[in-house]
Amino acid sequence: MAAGGSAPEPRVLVCLGALLAGWVAVGLEAVVIGEVHENVTLHCGNISGLRGQVTWYRNNSEPVFLLSSNSSLRPAEPRFSLVDATSLHIESLSLGDEGIYTCQEILNVTQWFQVWLQVASGPYQIEVHIVATGTLPNGTLYAARGSQVDFSCNSSSRPPPVVEWWFQALNSSSESFGHNLTVNFFSLLLISPNLQGNYTCLALNQLSKRHRKVTTELLVYYPPPSAPQCWAQMASGSFMLQLTCRWDGGYPDPDFLWIEEPGGVIVGKSKLGVEMLSESQLSDGKKFKCVTSHIVGPESGASCMVQIRGPSLLSEPMKTCFTGGNVTLTCQVSGAYPPAKILWLRNLTQPEVIIQPSSRHLITQDGQNSTLTIHNCSQDLDEGYYICRADSPVGVREMEIWLSVKEPLNIGGIVGTIVSLLLLGLAIISGLLLHYSPVFCWKVGNTSRGQNMDDVMVLVDSEEEEEEEEEEEEDAAVGEQEGAREREELPKEIPKQDHIHRVTALVNGNIEQMGNGFQDLQDDSSEEQSDIVQEEDRPV
């Protein structure tokens, strides 16, 4: 038997073929899934306890012997071995190992068990393609806002994998874009910033449940919506000029290039848009241009320009303050860009020492207008020159203001003097009027009061006036060339040639006598005037 142990094998295979052909229609008892390059174990039924002789076959067009527990039968390949004297162990699976395997067990009776081995492969080499606007130097993809982005994912797998896309925005959970067994391509139209994040392609082998995934970051860029803004200012803590350029509202931050105009000399380039210039680089009227560029912005970019100018000062050259009072000195700066820093100094008592706010000095500034208010003026402390200085990196300007401190005026004395002068003038005018008036008339009394008073009206021709008139007549006769003028002036005087003194008195309100007396006086005056005319007619 030992010598001819291998002789009966052909007859056994023929019998097994006939038996298996009738058994296949019964159905399979187990399905085992393995993966390429992995190992798998196929069990012979579900029986526990004492087992008989086991032989494994593979069902192709005809049964193929693989392995038997009979030590006299060698395995078909070294990859095949028995585990626990019943199970078939296959090493390093390949896609060709997939198929139906049959186990024959001979104990008291012969039993047959079938196992279906399925071999899965992959997914391997997932390839993700995202067609976007561009790629950064580090490999990160970016898309311009409002553009179209195409996504595709490919993987080698058996059976073909199920492809699923996942999206995760910043600081949020993942969400699925759906899965498909056949289509692994989709597009996003008019992409927006809220779709910026990580896109993951997941390929799943439904047979082996093995999956692979590839995550790709996609950034959504957009330029600022408005024009850039630039300005100049004094740097804090130093006497330098700071140029600042801003172009806000875009992502990512743009690039800034400062150049000097005209000439195009590059001042500096940075992501911050800030450049520092020393005084040696500055001059009145010089222009600086900021040129901005964005990765998805217009190719020509955008720009803005600043022009620096030195300050000019305007102030009152002289101010006056009364002792104990208050005075305000003003200083106005115009034309300065960037705005100048305004300082107040003394050039007499405290040369080049900046005046600081105190209880006596109040400094206020509104824009480019500054005021210095001095309280409780003192001639010893406050009188003198004050300097208003405008400091700017472009230039320094100074203006001197003279403050004069005086004693307050005596208002009462001034008013008294004016009143005295008015009274003196009135007295002089009254004296002149009294001196040159020929006739005076005083009316005394008031008949309406009904008082019992004696009212007297008196007309008096003094001896002195008569003598003066006679002298004037004699002088007129001497000067023949002045005769005519003297004759014109003579009627204005009332001569008293008859030297008659008339007195009319009204006593106890006798109105009738007063009227008669007044009439007699008028008659006498008329006679005197007629006598004067007759004398004028006589030859001299």
UniProtKB/Swiss-Prot annotation:
Residue ranges, Cytoplasmic side: 435-540
Q: What kind of membrane protein is this, topologically?
A: Single-pass type I membrane protein
The protein's recorded glycosylation sites are 39, 46, 70, 108, 138, 171, 180, 198, 326
Stretch forming the signal peptide = 1-30
Keyword terms: Disulfide bond, Glycoprotein, Immunoglobulin domain, Membrane, Repeat, Signal, Transmembrane, Transmembrane helix
Q: Which cysteines are joined by disulfide bonds?
A: 44-103, 153-201, 245-290, 331-388
Q: Where is the Ig-like C2-type domain?
A: 31-119, 123-215, 223-309, 311-404
Stretches assigned to the Extracellular side: 31-413
Q: Which SMART domains match?
A: IG (SM00409), IGc2 (SM00408), IGv (SM00406)
Compositional bias, Acidic residues, is annotated for 461-477, 521-534
Q: Which GO terms describe its molecular function?
A: cell adhesion molecule binding
Where do the record's region annotations for Disordered lie?
461-500, 513-540
Q: Which residues cross the membrane?
A: 414-434
Any one Gene Ontology BP term: cell-cell adhesion
List the subcellular locations: Membrane
Which PROSITE patterns has this protein been placed in?
Answer: IG_LIKE
Q: Where is the composition biased (Basic and acidic residues)?
A: 482-500
Give the record's GO CC terms. Answer: cell-cell junction; plasma membrane
Q: What is this protein called?
A: V-set and immunoglobulin domain-containing protein 10
**Name of the gene:** VSIG10
